[in-house]
Amino acid sequence: MPRKGPAPKRPLVKHPVYGSQLVTQLVNKILLKGKKSLAERIVYGALEHARDKTGTDPVITLKRALDNVKPALEVRSRRVGGATYQVPVEVRPDRSTTLALRWLVGFSRQRREKTMIERLANEILDASNGLGASVKRREDTHKMAEANRAFAHYRW
């Protein structure tokens, strides 16, 4: 444990093109091997693709998708007297956004479309409609928390 306390959170700048912190976070999640311009190109292309399909503001579509993917509960392992229990805990808002973006990007990488732009755009569109693998992941997480509700009194 550090003696000075937790490190302060660095403020995220709003994205210069879309004016949203969520787009900045999405670009940083897509980023591989320091190629930020490539990550930005992928995100811009995916958001334009989403705009063409829906005809609405892509940032609103992204927010709706994230709201459908953000988990409210998760399970954490807690060791009590030689047994390990999966204890359901509430997820902090910043962690739920991070998890949602991680799942969105991770499952878009596993999709079958040809380019990453198409994969990301279609995963965002599916998630905004309540479909897709990332929404299923959230449902599975909630089911796991519900199944282990008996251990909720072990929360810390």
Swiss-Prot record:
<dbReference type="GO" id="GO:0015935">
    <property type="term" value="C:small ribosomal subunit"/>
</dbReference>
<dbReference type="GO" id="GO:0000049">
    <property type="term" value="F:tRNA binding"/>
</dbReference>
<comment type="similarity">
    <text>Belongs to the universal ribosomal protein uS7 family.</text>
</comment>
<dbReference type="InterPro" id="IPR005717">
    <property type="entry name" value="Ribosomal_uS7_bac/org-type"/>
</dbReference>
<comment type="function">
    <text>One of the primary rRNA binding proteins, it binds directly to 16S rRNA where it nucleates assembly of the head domain of the 30S subunit. Is located at the subunit interface close to the decoding center, probably blocks exit of the E-site tRNA.</text>
</comment>
<comment type="subunit">
    <text>Part of the 30S ribosomal subunit. Contacts proteins S9 and S11.</text>
</comment>
<dbReference type="InterPro" id="IPR020606">
    <property type="entry name" value="Ribosomal_uS7_CS"/>
</dbReference>
<keyword id="KW-0699">rRNA-binding</keyword>
<keyword id="KW-0694">RNA-binding</keyword>
<dbReference type="InterPro" id="IPR036823">
    <property type="entry name" value="Ribosomal_uS7_dom_sf"/>
</dbReference>
<protein>
    <recommendedName>
        <fullName>Small ribosomal subunit protein uS7</fullName>
    </recommendedName>
</protein>
<keyword id="KW-0689">Ribosomal protein</keyword>
<dbReference type="GO" id="GO:0019843">
    <property type="term" value="F:rRNA binding"/>
</dbReference>
<keyword id="KW-0687">Ribonucleoprotein</keyword>
<dbReference type="GO" id="GO:0003735">
    <property type="term" value="F:structural constituent of ribosome"/>
</dbReference>
<dbReference type="GO" id="GO:0006412">
    <property type="term" value="P:translation"/>
</dbReference>
<dbReference type="InterPro" id="IPR023798">
    <property type="entry name" value="Ribosomal_uS7_dom"/>
</dbReference>
<dbReference type="Pfam" id="PF00177">
    <property type="entry name" value="Ribosomal_S7"/>
</dbReference>
<keyword id="KW-0820">tRNA-binding</keyword>
<dbReference type="InterPro" id="IPR000235">
    <property type="entry name" value="Ribosomal_uS7"/>
</dbReference>
